[in-house]
Amino acid sequence: MDNQHKKIKGYRDLSQEEIDMMNRVKELGSQFEKLIQDVSDHLRGQYNASLHNRDEITRIANAEPGRWLAIGKTDIQTGMMAIIRAIAQPDSF
């Protein structure tokens, strides 16, 4: 498993500092994943608590919190991958 990335075409050897930075990014990714799940759980609870309140259901539907959470999740994933790519500096597209 040592230097496993050597076997992946287009990737160079990483320094220990770069490996540590990549691990920090991965750790932050896990924290973001937990936060996104917490927000999703909150939204589900908010919706379920409002089932008998048509005005609140309409307000929630108009605000589109699920859509915005999905956009946020995708953008965070994209950002995390961009940071990883900046650290790894692969030589291919």
Curated annotation (Swiss-Prot):
Residues where 3',3'-cGAMP binds: Q4, Y11, K26
The answer to keyword Nucleotide-binding applying to this record is yes
Q: Name one Pfam family in it.
A: Acb2_Tad1_hairpin
Matching InterPro entries, A to Z? Acb2/Tad1_hairpin (IPR056098)
This protein's record includes keyword Magnesium: no
Q: Which domain of life is it from?
A: Viruses
State the family named in the UniProt similarity comment for this chain.
Belongs to the Acb2 family.
Task performed by this protein: Antagonizes CBASS (cyclic oligonucleotide-based antiphage signaling system). Binds and sequesters host-produced 3',3'-cyclic GMP-AMP (cGAMP) with a dissociation constant of about 87 nM; each homohexamer binds 3 cGAMP molecules with 1 cGAMP molecule binding to 2 monomers. Sequestration of cGAMP inhibits the cGAMP-activated phospholipase activity of host CBASS effector protein CapV. Does not degrade the cyclic nucleotide.
State the name under which the record lists this protein.
Anti-CBASS protein 2
Native organism is: Pseudomonas phage PaMx33
